[in-house]
Amino acid sequence: MADLAECNIKVMCRFRPLNESEVNRGDKYIAKFQGEDTVVIASKPYAFDRVFQSSTSQEQVYNDCAKKIVKDVLEGYNGTIFAYGQTSSGKTHTMEGKLHDPEGMGIIPRIVQDIFNYIYSMDENLEFHIKVSYFEIYLDKIRDLLDVSKTNLSVHEDKNRVPYVKGCTERFVCSPDEVMDTIDEGKSNRHVAVTNMNEHSSRSHSIFLINVKQENTQTEQKLSGKLYLVDLAGSEKVSKTGAEGAVLDEAKNINKSLSALGNVISALAEGSTYVPYRDSKMTRILQDSLGGNCRTTIVICCSPSSYNESETKSTLLFGQRAKTIKNTVCVNVELTAEQWKKKYEKEKEKNKILRNTIQWLENELNRWRNGETVPIDEQFDKEKANLEAFTVDKDITLTNDKPATAIGVIGNFTDAERRKCEEEIAKLYKQLDDKDEEINQQSQLVEKLKTQMLDQEELLASTRRDQDNMQAELNRLQAENDASKEEVKEVLQALEELAVNYDQKSQEVEDKTKEYELLSDELNQKSATLASIDAELQKLKEMTNHQKKRAAEMMASLLKDLAEIGIAVGNNDVKQPEGTGMIDEEFTVARLYISKMKSEVKTMVKRCKQLESTQTESNKKMEENEKELAACQLRISQHEAKIKSLTEYLQNVEQKKRQLEESVDALSEELVQLRAQEKVHEMEKEHLNKVQTANEVKQAVEQQIQSHRETHQKQISSLRDEVEAKAKLITDLQDQNQKMMLEQERLRVEHEKLKATDQEKSRKLHELTVMQDRREQARQDLKGLEETVAKELQTLHNLRKLFVQDLATRVKKSAEIDSDDTGGSAAQKQKISFLENNLEQLTKVHKQLVRDNADLRCELPKLEKRLRATAERVKALESALKEAKENASRDRKRYQQEVDRIKEAVRSKNMARRGHSAQIAKPIRPGQHPAASPTHPSAIRGGGAFVQNSQPVAVRGGGGKQV
C-alpha cells in the first residue's frame, strides 16, 4: 500500500422545499443561509463543507458532493457517500432521484455514468473489472436485493480485517446500462411503506457497492477501489408518522440502527478508545467508512418546516460531530514481484545500517563502562549516522559492475583501523555482487512462502469451520438416530404383541370350531326330536279333521231336529208354549253349558296369565342374559372366532323358533275349531239330553288343552335350559378373559424388561453419518402400519357400538310390544317375530365380523413383511453405523495426507475465483464508449470496434481485436 494520509469526513447539508402537507398546515420556513457553507436555525449557525438551498438542482448537488470521489475510486482509494436525515427529508431523492430522467436523477445513476466516462478517457494500457452488489438492512437483517432467497446474510472480515457481507450476490458489469438494470432489479425488491409523513417511505437501509479493480498491462501494477452508496432509512417519531403493526416494528429497528450510528459518530468525534461498531450490522459494514481507510461524504438532508424543527436540529448536530472525524486513507495497491524485491532490499540495507549503529553504540558504551573517556569527536553523532546511511543507500543504487567506493567511517579512527575497514568494505561489496542472484531467488521464495502461508491459514480456518459443522451435524444425526431407534423398537414391540395376540386368537378359533361341531351334533339330535313332534302333530290334525266331520254331522242333525220342532210349534198352537218352554229349556241348558265353559275359560286365562308372568320373568332373565351376552360380545369382538360359533348356534335357535311358530299357529287354529265344535256339541247334547256325550267331549277337549299346555311347558323348560347353557358359556368366556388379562400383564412385565434391555443397548451407539433417507422410509412404512391397525381398531369399535344400539332398540321394542298386547297367541307371535329380528341382526353382524376377519388375515402377510423389512432396516442401520465409525477412524489417519492435496486444490480454486459466486469477468479497456448490446458478454475497443462472443472479450486501443 501507499503512504497513509489523513482527511476529514466531508459533510454536505441539503434542505428540501416545503411539501404540500406542510404548506397546507401553514408551517414556517425556518432555515436561513449565510454564504455557501452556513445555515442558521433558531439564531444558531451550523457550518459545513457546503450547504444546499431548496432550489439547488440535482446536478449541482452531484458536482459538489460526489464528482471528485469518482477520480479517487479509480485511483485506488475507497469511497463512501451516504444520506442521513429524518423521514421524508429527501434522502432517497438525493441518492437515487428519478433513475432514468437526465435532470431528476440523483447521485447513484450520475456517478455510475461518470465512472465509465472516466474509464473511457484513461490510458489504454489499463484493464478494469467492475462488479456491483446491492443489499438492504431490514429489521437488522441483511437481505440481498439481487437474490431475494438470501434473507439473513452475515458480516465477516477478510485477511486485512476489512468487513464484508459474506454470500452477497456480485455481478460483473461492463456498461452503465447493465448497472442501471441491476439497480432497477434491486429497487423493485426493496421494502417501502406509506406513512403519514411520506407516501414512499424507505423501511430499510440500502447499500449499493461498486468494486473497481484495474491492472496496468505494461507495469502489471494492480489497484482496487470500493465505492459504497448508502441510502439510509429516516428516523421516525411514531406520534407523527402514525406507524402501526409491522410498520411500527420497522420504525423501531430503523431508530435503533440510527442510534447505533450516532453512538459511533460520537465516539469517533470524542476520540474514544472504544468505538461500538458491532452494535449494529449497518455500522459494522460501514466500519471502514467511519474512521478507517475511506474518503467519506455525508449528505445530511433536512426539513425546513417549523413542524420538524427538533428533528432538523438533531440532524445538523449529527453532521457537525461527523465533520470532526478523520479518516486515514491510502491507495489499495498490489505490489508486483519486482516492487516487493526492491522494498525488501531497501529494508534489508536499513536493517544493516541499524546493526552497525547498534554495534558502534555498544562499543562506545563498553569504553565508558571500562573507565575510558570517549572524546566528543569519537562519540555517536546522529547527523553523521544519517550521512552514513545516505552514503550506503546511494552506493547500493549503483550498478554491480562499477567498483565500489569506500564508505567513510564515522569518527576519528587510526590509519590501521581505517585501512582495515576499507578492506572489509571491499570484501563486502564483492560478496554483494556474488549474492545478487541469491537475493533475487530469496525474495521470490519469500513471496511464495507468504502466499503459501496465507493459503494454509485460510485452508486451516476453513477446515476447522468445516470440522465444527460436521461435528455439529454428526451430533444432530446421532440424536436423531437414537430417537429413531426408540421409535423402531416401540413399533417392533407393538408388532410382537399383535403377533402373540393373533396366535392366541387362532387357538381360540380352533377351540370354537370344536364347540361348533358339538353344537352341530346337538342340533341334529334336536332335529330328530322335532321330526317326531311333527309326526305327532300330523296325527292330531287327522283326529281334528275327524272330529270336525263328526261335529258337522251332529250340527246338521241338530238343525233338522230344530226345524222339525219349529214346524211342530208353528202348526200346533197348544204345543207352542211347550215348544217355547222346550226351546227356553234348551237355551237354558246351553247357557248353563256356556257359563261352565266361561268359567273354564277364565281358569284357562288365569293359567295363561300365570304362564305369561312366568314367561315375563323368563323374558327378563333372557334380557339379563342378553345384556350379559352383549358384554360377552364386546369381549368377543376381540376374539372373532367365538362370535362365529355363537351366531351359528343362534341360527339353529332361529330354525327351532320358526318351527315352534308354525306349531303354535296350527294349534291356535285347532283351538278355534275345537271351540266351535264344543258349542255345537253342547247344543247337540242339550237338545238330545246326551249329557254324558257332552261330558266326554268336554273331557276330550280338556285333554287336548292339557296336552297343549304340557307341550308349551316343555318348550319353556327347553328355553330355560338353553338360557342356562348360555349363562354357563358366558361364565366360561369370562374365565378365559381373566386368564388372558393375566397373560397380558405377564407379557407387559416381560415387555418392560425387554424395553430396559433395549435401552441399555441403545446407549452404546454414538455416531451416525449417513442413512437419513432410509430412516425416513422406515418412518413412512411404520406410519402406514399404524394407520392400518388404527383403522381395524376403529372398525371393531364401530361394530361394537352398532351392536349395542341395535340390542337396546330391540329391548325397547320388546317392552312396548309386551305392554301393548297381553293376549296369548298374539303375544307369542310378537315375541317370536322379535326373536327373528334379533337373529337376523346377529346374522348380519356375524357376516360382517367374518368379512373383517378375512380382511385381517389378508393384511397379516403384509404386516409380517413390513416387520421383516423393518428388522432388516435396523440391521442395515447398525451395520452402516459401524462402517461410519470405521470410515471416521480411517479418515482421521489419512487426514495429514489429505490436507496437502486439499491445500493445492483450494489454492488453485482461490486463484480462479474472484468473488463469492462464479461469474464471467468482463474486462473494460479505456479508449471509447461501448457499442455492444448489454445483453451479450462483450468488451470495448478504441476506435469503435466491438466483438460479441460467448466468452469474455478483452479490448485494446486502436480498434484491434483481441479475443
Curated annotation (Swiss-Prot):
Show the segment(s) annotated as Globular: 915-963
One GO BP on record is: plus-end-directed vesicle transport along microtubule
Protein keywords: Acetylation, ATP-binding, Coiled coil, Cytoplasm, Cytoskeleton, Isopeptide bond, Lysosome, Membrane, Methylation, Microtubule, Motor protein, Nucleotide-binding, Phosphoprotein, Ubl conjugation
Where's the Glycyl lysine isopeptide (Lys-Gly) (interchain with G-Cter in SUMO2) crosslink? K213
Which Pfam family, any one of them, does this sequence belong to?
Kinesin
Is Acyltransferase among this UniProt entry's keywords? no
Q: Which residues carry this modification: N-acetylalanine?
A: A2
Residues bearing the modification Omega-N-methylarginine: R956
What GO molecular function annotations does the UniProt record carry, in alphabetical order? ATP binding; ATP hydrolysis activity; cadherin binding; identical protein binding; microtubule binding; microtubule motor activity; plus-end-directed microtubule motor activity; protein-containing complex binding
The UniProt entry lists membrane topology as: Peripheral membrane protein
Region: Disordered, residue numbers: 908-963
> Is Glycosyltransferase among this UniProt entry's keywords?
no
Residues binding ATP are G85, Q86, T87, S88, S89, G90, K91, T92
Q: Provide the protein's localization.
A: Cytoplasm, Cytoskeleton; Cytolytic granule membrane; Lysosome membrane
User: Which superkingdom?
Assistant: Eukaryota
Q: Name the CDD domains on file.
A: Khc_CBD_cc, KISc_KHC_KIF5
The family line of this record is: Belongs to the TRAFAC class myosin-kinesin ATPase superfamily. Kinesin family. Kinesin subfamily.
Known PANTHER family for this protein? CENTROMERE PROTEIN E, KINESIN-LIKE PROTEIN
- Assembly information from the UniProt record: Oligomer composed of two heavy chains and two light chains. Interacts with GRIP1 and PPP1R42. Interacts with SYBU. Interacts with JAKMIP1. Interacts with PLEKHM2. Interacts with ECPAS. Interacts with ZFYVE27. Found in a complex with OGT, RHOT1, RHOT2 and TRAK1. Interacts with APP (via cytoplasmic domain).
Function of the protein: Microtubule-dependent motor required for normal distribution of mitochondria and lysosomes. Can induce formation of neurite-like membrane protrusions in non-neuronal cells in a ZFYVE27-dependent manner. Regulates centrosome and nuclear positioning during mitotic entry. During the G2 phase of the cell cycle in a BICD2-dependent manner, antagonizes dynein function and drives the separation of nuclei and centrosomes. Required for anterograde axonal transportation of MAPK8IP3/JIP3 which is essential for MAPK8IP3/JIP3 function in axon elongation.
Q: What is the protein name given in its UniProt record?
A: Kinesin-1 heavy chain
Annotated organism of origin: Homo sapiens (Human)
Identify the taxonomic lineage of the organism of origin: Eukaryota, Metazoa, Chordata, Craniata, Vertebrata
This chain is encoded by the gene named KIF5B
